[in-house]
Amino acid sequence: AFFRTGELEPCLYEVRAVTTDAAHARRVYEGFRRFSPEVGPFLRRAYWTCLPEKELAIYHFAAKLYREGKLLLQRLSDETYHPLLRAVRQLNGELEQYRGFVRFSDIGVLAAEIEPKNRVLPLLRGHFCQRCHDETFFLYDRTHREALFYADGHSAIVPLEEFVMAPPDEAEKRYRRLWRCFYDTIAIRERENPKLRMSHMPKRFWPLLTELQSDPDAIPPSPSPCAAFAAPGAPAAIPAPATRQAPAPSAPASAP
């Protein structure tokens, strides 16, 4: 097994420290190109997964790839290849979910927390730095105890053992209530499908989603769900006439 510095567990076997040789690692990484330009990025993502003993799994796959060549990449059920493929698919799925399930709060800067199974923060870095390039923000990973900081076009991922989100001020509470109001207003009660929602938005994400948190400062219900947020003197909303929803186009047949 491989252990990082500070993570060594008591064992009965001899432990040998391995010094990182960056030049050697670069040569090996570049050497993967002769098999496929996708091997290097694939193994990099495999390292960010939560696969148990992933370092050993990556080593066995890389050694076998050098022995057997690119034909190994066609054997998707290979005992050294398949576990990595499955782990990377799970990582990619979680990454896509967190691109949509991060909720920032304004506490002087934009702040958010995530609790992923895989180490997705390095992969989320480019997405949020590009999307929020005019902001100052940080994103804290509770699982891996690290945070992404961004300000003035510069970003860094640094270890952070503990972080407690500051309580929201009145302005932030109001924005949260507005977001919950929007979420509830666009819902079509007759078409609710809890099982489908959980398949697209698993319950483990819910505690950090603003729209699904309990609101101790909730505004009492009114005839219009968002009436409490209307500007003074604004006319009441006129309900839209009922419309019949057009059927969705059928998906094209997939290739065999």
Model-derived features with residue positions:
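Extended, well-ordered protein cores
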Residues: 1-244
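Long, low-complexity, intrinsically disordered segments
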Residues: 241-256
